[in-house]
């Protein structure tokens, strides 16, 4: 809903009565959208500066012209103002703020808050909501390798809670000594917590401390003649020492530091963050942004707030942070707020020398390389957008593209995927899938109609329809989408286009149809607009296939048992309660299956034959 605030907002009176306290201010346009969020020690002076005479960059002048309303929040201190500003920027992503988008989502190891916690990994910064986090790790493979290592050393459960709660006997992990089986009470709370405490030290990098503690426990168990217990500790030491030989070393906090390099070119900027431990780069991360009208200090200020005052999770925070040269006085308050949040003093190094200078130069080289890749990719993508706009004869620039594709398995488990591309590229977080229901087997036309109808309905309600909607298919598919567009009256709001391989089904020779136009179009296979259509279409196809495979896999697992006469819902539930999952059931013998309440030897034989 559009709300014009400019008519009832008295800017002159508002500025005259502003408080001099610290706090956060929000600039809103005539639609009620937040276009900028800032913080200030003195709200009156800071906000008034936007409207006073004096030199301002073009970006600020453009923003001021759009301000229809200003809202403020007073905070108890400058520190709280920084935190609130950071949270509001992440929540609303105002178009005039410097926005950072990490080039990937890093995985974290998480120890849950359950009575008998599990260790798992999450590829999200929201992982901290699940329990105590360790990381981030540089890749999925590195975190999986760590999980495998943990399983060999520490018998802590890794299973899902649903599986854990359904157990009535130990699973295979207990039998191979990779779990203590807390699910069936084979370990005391104290014993489990002891292993958990050692694991936490291990994940925090306290390698020497872990070795010493396990050695002490092994000798103590031996003296107490608890030889089985001593053997467990001995086995842990064997694996740990093997890891030590592979140069896994203790992390020394005083040799742990971050290096932040910035490189700027034209209206773009790139930031490289190197995380150093014991003289080695253990992680490198990059951010590339549009930085028109910004200088190095303002970008560094925005980045430090984004990264260190946000929800970043670190086991060990650095004692030293090395920065590209900026105006130190401008970010002193922010530095103090970061130290306050982290809970330790930080040595900020702005003009490094010797070894520290070497690290800073490395970070700046990384930032430059990343920016070259970013600008090249962005330039190519913008050319494709402009070419597609020209082909579709659109007056406005394309800000959002959505593409639909249908996938099914022999007519069943039908999935519609919708992928999203914006003027910045693929927006994976906005991708979604639709489970298609109540249609005839293999009816792609009905599936497209249902998926597009659901998307248009929700899009009108949320006011977030795309500029261009692509349908994977030919005339039949696009006609279904046209029917939906007519039903909702959006023929002039969204440009409809379809891309199909035609009779020849040759890649690069696809047939293109525009909405409400039966003309068949073809474009040169090297045409930038055509390449974008194919790029988006292929993403939708991959997204649909992945979703459909998951659905088929889930359906198959349950249908195997459903096909056996005499195994109804109650017996299926009993089997799951006893074995905890289809995989465990498939490994069980006939005699083991027959132990389940309500399952005869004959029925157990039939169940066993289903899996063999």
Swiss-Prot record:
Ranges for domain GIY-YIG come to 20-98
Q: Which GO terms describe its cellular component?
A: cytoplasm; excinuclease repair complex
GO biological process, alphabetically ordered: nucleotide-excision repair; SOS response
User: InterPro entries in the record, alphabetically?
Assistant: GIY-YIG_endonuc, GIY-YIG_endonuc_sf, GIY-YIG_UvrC_Cho, RuvA_2-like, UVR_dom, UVR_dom_sf, UvrABC_protein_C, UvrC
Cellular location of this protein?
Cytoplasm
Q: Which keywords label this protein?
A: Cytoplasm, DNA damage, DNA excision, DNA repair, Excision nuclease, SOS response
In which broad location class does this protein mainly occur, judging by the first location in its UniProt entry?
cytoplasm
Residue ranges occupied by any UVR domain in the UniProt entry: 208-243
Q: Name one GO molecular function term.
A: excinuclease ABC activity
Pfam assignment, any one = HHH_5
Query: Which SUPFAM superfamilies does this one have?
Result: C-terminal UvrC-binding domain of UvrB (SSF46600), GIY-YIG endonuclease (SSF82771), RuvA domain 2-like (SSF47781)
Q: How does it assemble?
A: Interacts with UvrB in an incision complex.
Question: What is the purpose of this protein?
Answer: The UvrABC repair system catalyzes the recognition and processing of DNA lesions. UvrC both incises the 5' and 3' sides of the lesion. The N-terminal half is responsible for the 3' incision and the C-terminal half is responsible for the 5' incision.
PANTHER family from the xrefs?
UVRABC SYSTEM PROTEIN C, UVRC/OXIDOREDUCTASE
Q: What family does the database annotate? A: Belongs to the UvrC family.
Q: What is this protein called?
A: UvrABC system protein C
Q: Which organism is it from?
A: Francisella tularensis subsp. tularensis (strain SCHU S4 / Schu 4)
